[in-house]
Amino acid sequence: MISNAPMHLWQGRIDLAEGLAARRWHQWVQPWAEQQPAGIALLGLACDEGVKRNQGRTGASQGPAALRAALANLAWHGTGPLYDAGDVTCTDHHLESAQKRYAERLGLLLEQGHLVLGLGGGHEIAFASFSGLADHLRRQQPCPRIGILNFDAHFDLRHAPQSSSGTPFRQIAEYCRQAGMPFEYCCLGVSELSNTQALFEQARELDVRYLLDRQMQGWNLPAVEACLDAFLDGIDVLYMTLCLDVLPASQAPGVSAPSAHGVDVQVVEHLVRRARASGKLRVADIAELNPGLDQDQRTARVAARLLASLIH
């Protein structure tokens, strides 16, 4: 099911004394409609069926609403249009149908020239986002080289009888194989203790570029930047996805699988901005926000900040 933009969630402070320069996100965003000027389009996937199938803690289906509420009161520093394109909702456990609908709506937004920012939902959003982008770009000849940049404690390359939040990048690899496209996947922040030897072997077989969470520290930032830059130099178009469990549990408690180590938000935000500055970003999303597990809206707030860093 696709629902219209939940504009009632966009509420916040209004500073009348400072005038137009004091606008916040809730004063700038407008519901998406066709035939509007190109801008930034927010699209939610209200789904955690993939988390359930992956034996995780459910609740991420409420993530898009919580993320909108956290974004609403942020100061707006952008210039172009900002649209809310509503939510695709997973009903009756039909994850694959929800992913297909999300991919189709994302493709429509790309056709209209928008930068699409996805609001998760479980990390099953990744396959939906990539397939929507790839389907759109494959109409071009030759098809641009798509790079997948994932900030995540997990490779999400599992083999499983059903798709889940643990399988999206294996699904993407299979999509690429069938389409004759290169599988360009870079995963930053991997937790060695949260990924089995089998998953590391799968990553090696697929030529995945990755850095461990313990490598993604401020003292090692030049090496991390070099790794990211080399990846970005080899692609034409970037899809970026950020799983909030890449952050330490102290910064992001509201996820299905909190990280004991993680990568500090300052490092993640710096790299997100660096990737955005490449000029290659077409689609990005944030995944695994679970409001029911959050503390003082800490995870929602940091998610909102990271999403805002893609714009400001």
Swiss-Prot record:
Task performed by this protein: Catalyzes the conversion of N-formimidoyl-L-glutamate to L-glutamate and formamide.
GO biological process annotation, one example: putrescine biosynthetic process from arginine, via agmatine
UniProt remark on cofactor binding: Binds 2 manganese ions per subunit.
KW Hydrolase (keyword) present: yes
One Pfam match: Arginase
Pathway annotation: Amino-acid degradation; L-histidine degradation into L-glutamate; L-glutamate from N-formimidoyl-L-glutamate (hydrolase route): step 1/1
Binding-site residues for Mn(2+) 1, renumbered to this chain: 123, 152, 156, 243
Keywords tagged on the record: Histidine metabolism, Hydrolase, Manganese, Metal-binding
The protein's name in its UniProt record: Formimidoylglutamase
Positions contributing to Mn(2+) 2 binding: 152, 154, 243, 245
Reaction catalysis annotation: N-formimidoyl-L-glutamate + H2O = formamide + L-glutamate
Entry EC number(s): 3.5.3.8
Family named by the database record: Belongs to the arginase family.
Species of origin: Pseudomonas fluorescens (strain ATCC BAA-477 / NRRL B-23932 / Pf-5)
Xref: HAMAP family: Formimidoylglutam
GO molecular function: agmatinase activity; formimidoylglutamase activity; manganese ion binding
Protein's UniProt keywords contain Hydrolase: yes
Xref: InterPro entries: HutG, Ureohydrolase, Ureohydrolase_dom_sf
Required cofactor names: Mn(2+)
